[in-house]
Amino acid sequence: MNIQINNIHSTNSLSIIKALSRIEKYDIIVIGSDIYKKGECAGSLLVDKYYQAPPITQEAEYINFLNDVNEKENVDLLIPASDAEAVLLSKYINQVKTKFFLADYETVALFKDKLKATQELMKNNIKVPRICDNLFNEKKVIFRKRNSVNSLGIYIVDLEKAEYIENHFHPDYFVQPYIEGDTVIVDVFSDKEGVPKLIIPRKTIEIKDGTAFRSQIVYDETIIAI
């Protein structure tokens, strides 16, 4: 089985590569790519085959690159490993010859924008922290960048203790109350009809480069039922 993973300098891609290397049941060939030359990023030395890719911002060139690699390597599955790639693949789903699994473009693009995603969740009566229109009577808040990955663009400030506030008052950011407590990430595996088949809550133990690096699987019926 030939599996392609792009943007392999990232933590997400490296984690996927390491997970695939542990699978003994199947003969898996990992094909990796990134904008760097081979040897300039660690991931390029961890895959079976490596290709230097054009920047994902060059959409037409990137799609042609994916199709060229698919033709040369007969790729069975492409695993998107970044938000930007997920948006691009869903946008050009009919032009990419390699098989991959993603939601439709409207859904992927919606959740790329954290403010729009939060507003949509509210419309569907899903409980999320409210959006602060002003900071009067607020205590501790979090400024969130609308389009960002990992924990980039996060600014947390205790208004009762801070002597000054960084200027994040512009349309690229929005503000919510800061919620104290543990962070639980929930992995959901669904079938083609969107019916959940496997739900795994994970309590974050360690964060690396803005993402959950170590987690503890927890059985919480309340979270699973949501």
Predicted regions and their residues:
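A glycine-centered beta->alpha junction motif in the catalytic cores
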Residues: 181, 205-206
